[in-house]
């Protein structure tokens, strides 16, 4: 069964690139034609690259990895949050905080501060003894932290891979990932640089339907990876139980041999 069909890609407008005057010549090989001043992306290639990205994400998650979904522009925010939440993966959909990967230790401290403020807000007497102004300041701090870091609240280490919508806008995230040798999976529009992406998906990174469809493909790969991981763990547990059983059966025989009286 295909990960996604040509019809779905067409319906979502994945084939529409940028105006011909706004392009990156390195994307030439992914362009099918030009129509009314707009580049049309070769969806046959998109299908091939989607399969490669899907398998990579699936295997990454199957081996215990995590995928960070990143898309802070308006057209990507909802898709990134919805699909990441659907499969329990972290996401960034408002602002990329510099050092989010390369200085994760400091980011972790801010995450702890956010959780501290959330616990204070949830407690019955969390703000007891504080003035209205202090409560207001703490609430503002919590809201700001939640907006920027809420999607990575449960991320305890740097991710195994990144799914990025618009590598130009998220160039800092791409640079940090490269610095830490974290693979990048991303939509490549006709104005992007394919050299900065490990697993490219040629397509429209501006249309809401396109970003939603392609993010859904990646979240489905995560879902499949989780299933594969569970199956492997179950198989390993069965093998371990099978190895232990013969040992348990041999133990009484050995005990009887030790207790038998010596012949006179």
UniProtKB/Swiss-Prot annotation:
Q: Which GO terms describe its biological process?
A: translation
- List the InterPro entries: Ribosomal_uS2, Ribosomal_uS2_bac/mit/plastid, Ribosomal_uS2_CS, Ribosomal_uS2_flav_dom_sf
Q: Which Pfam families match?
A: Ribosomal_S2
Q: Keyword check for Ribonucleoprotein, yes or no.
A: yes
Report keywords, A-Z.
Answer: Ribonucleoprotein, Ribosomal protein
Record-linked Gene3D superfamilies: Glucose-6-phosphate isomerase like protein, domain 1, Helix hairpin bin
Q: Which GO terms describe its molecular function?
A: structural constituent of ribosome
Q: Give the UniProt entry's GO cellular component terms.
A: cytosolic small ribosomal subunit
Instruction: Tell me the segments the record calls region Disordered.
Output: 225-264
Q: Does the keyword rRNA processing apply?
A: no
Q: What family does this chain come from, according to its entry?
A: Belongs to the universal ribosomal protein uS2 family.
* Matching PANTHER family: 30S RIBOSOMAL PROTEIN S2 PROKARYOTIC AND ORGANELLAR (PTHR12534), SMALL RIBOSOMAL SUBUNIT PROTEIN US2M (PTHR12534:SF0)
Protein name per its UniProtKB record? Small ribosomal subunit protein uS2
The uppermost taxa in this organism's lineage are: Bacteria, Bacillati, Actinomycetota, Actinomycetes, Mycobacteriales
**Gene that encodes the chain:** rpsB
